[in-house]
Amino acid sequence: MSQALTENRTVTSIEAQKAILKAFKQKRPIFLWGPMGIGKSELMQGTVDSGVLGNALLIDLRMALMEPTDIKGIPFYNKELGLMDWAPPIDLPTKELASQYDTVVLFLDELNSAPQSTQAAAYQLVLNHRVGNYVLPDNVVIVAAGNRETDKGVTYRM
C-alpha cells in the first residue's frame, strides 16, 4: 500500500507575493493553500492595489457559492444559428473590460470548497483559459485559493 506524499511549504506574505508575480510573468496559474483567515484574499487585493501589476483589476469569485452554470453560462436557443448557444456568465471578464487594464486577476477563492462539478468547470478555465465558447482575454491571470483539508473546514479533495 502506497502513501500519498504531500509537501507543505510555509511562506511569508512577501514570499507568496513574489511567487505570485513570477507565476504571472510566466502566464501560469497558481493555487494558494492556507488555513481560514490567514489572509489569502487580502494578499491578492494588496498585490493588485500595490501597483506592481500596473493598472490592474481583481475579480474575486467565491467558488463555494457558485454552480457550474455560473462559470460556463446558461444554454439558450439561438434563432439566428438555429442551434443551442451559451449565454456567457457576467462575472467573467469580457475582452472589452480586460482591454481597460494592464492585468486582470481572476481570483477563484474557496475553489476546493466548491462542489466538484463547479471545480470541474473552473479547471477548464484554469487549464485551458476557456470554458465552452468563452475564452479568457490574454491579459487575464488566474489565482485560485482554498483551505487545507487538515483545517477541518468545508473542503473537497482536488
Regions found by a protein language model. Name each.
Residues S2-M158:
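AAA+ P-loop NTPase catalytic core and its hallmark functional loops
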